């Protein structure tokens, strides 16, 4: 039988669970299994690593691939079609299938390479001082959205400006 450890708890917990009547220990303690007891049923959770990212093991491949930056719904479906692979749960994949999936994903620009590419593209726009580059520099939207009322994400928090005060005579 597992060892038990007594932990102090609030009176309300013992009253809610009606635990105080059956407890051989004092009224303010709660017995829990000791943490140093060995667990015979070890739980093994295997996360697959694809494209430098640990994708969730308990989801289908189509949705797991979307955790990789640069792979969305369409690209994930296209990868499965190209490999002629069924959309099963990630942890049920064989090691060979995982290797083939890694090879296919590595053909695309993902994660750090994609982020670097986008950052360099924005930097180039800023250097040539085109309209989009200037809007990036100013921290404003560059795709034609109105800025009078919205675009708080780019402009930041609203700053209160003191208006004209009426002078009392």
From Swiss-Prot:
Pfam families: Ribosomal_S13
GO molecular function, one term: mRNA binding
Entries under InterPro entries matching the protein: Rbsml_uS13_C, Ribosomal_uS13, Ribosomal_uS13-like_H2TH, Ribosomal_uS13_bac-type, Ribosomal_uS13_CS
Subunit structure: Part of the 30S ribosomal subunit.
Similarity section: Belongs to the universal ribosomal protein uS13 family.
Function, as annotated: Located at the top of the head of the 30S subunit, it contacts several helices of the 16S rRNA.
Protein name in the entry: Small ribosomal subunit protein uS13c
Lineage of the species this protein comes from: Eukaryota, Viridiplantae, Streptophyta, Embryophyta, Tracheophyta
